[in-house]
């Protein structure tokens, strides 16, 4: 795996990462390289630390008291965990979509425009173009173009999640984090999200947390298996699912554990 992986540029380098909820040591000495324009999946049983790890990539944990990260997370060589790094710039470069669709209580149009207005000064025409572009990227434009000024909450669950993805890409980030984006969706909506992920990786580096191992196998280029806060195995998805190096990984993937 490493020979193949090294041919692909690393977008995010994680070095000696430890994470704490108060005194609880939740992530232990994680080292990994997230490849550019690839999909990386984090798998593992509930409570293993995969969502916690994901949220260190844009310092989302800082919204909650008592949580802290130690080590380095390098985005194109810049350590995101230093106090010198502007948190607003991190959030502009690293977008995030959560498990439950979370449209803002405003129109579909304003859901997309909201984040853009924080970082850019666009004319009305430019904003209209950006909104259409983002909704098109999320394969949603044709479904909502005639009701763009209706509430985002009027959409179905699957449409709401694609709206959140459109909102994430509207600010043109470099990395998109997806925290179990399909867990609350029906199979048809899930299939649309998976198709969307395959398209998004051509322009973004995508990291997805999923409990669905079939989804990880279908969608990702690389897979990380975590257990009790430790990175047990990380490699090309084909290798992880067909010939894992560790018995613990095989036991989890085959359903004998977890």
Swiss-Prot record:
Describe the reaction catalysed, as an equation.
phosphate(out) + ATP + H2O = ADP + 2 phosphate(in) + H(+)
Q: Per UniProt, what is one GO molecular function of this protein?
A: ATPase-coupled phosphate ion transmembrane transporter activity
Q: Can you say where in the cell this protein is located?
A: Cell inner membrane
Keywords for this entry? ATP-binding, Cell inner membrane, Cell membrane, Membrane, Nucleotide-binding, Phosphate transport, Translocase, Transport
Known Gene3D superfamilies for this protein? P-loop containing nucleotide triphosphate hydrolases
Single GO biological process annotation from the record: phosphate ion transmembrane transport
Recorded E.C. number(s)? 7.3.2.1
Q: Which domain of life is it from?
A: Bacteria
Look up and give the membrane topology term: Peripheral membrane protein
Q: Which Pfam families match?
A: ABC_tran
Task: Detail which positions bind ATP.
Answer: 44-51
- By its UniProt entry, which SUPFAM superfamilies does this protein fall under? P-loop containing nucleoside triphosphate hydrolases
Where is it predominantly found? membrane
Coiled-coil stretches: none
Q: Record's Gene Ontology CC terms?
A: plasma membrane
* All copies of domain ABC transporter, residue ranges: 12-253
What's the family?
Answer: Belongs to the ABC transporter superfamily. Phosphate importer (TC 3.A.1.7) family.
**Sorted alphabetically, which NCBIfam families does this protein's record hold?**
3a0107s01c2 (TIGR00972)
Summary of the function given for this chain in its UniProt record: Part of the ABC transporter complex PstSACB involved in phosphate import. Responsible for energy coupling to the transport system.
Quaternary structure per UniProt? The complex is composed of two ATP-binding proteins (PstB), two transmembrane proteins (PstC and PstA) and a solute-binding protein (PstS).
Q: What is this protein called?
A: Phosphate import ATP-binding protein PstB
Q: Could you tell me which species this protein originates from?
A: Bordetella avium (strain 197N)
- Lineage from the top down? Bacteria, Pseudomonadati, Pseudomonadota, Betaproteobacteria, Burkholderiales
Give the gene that encodes this protein.
pstB
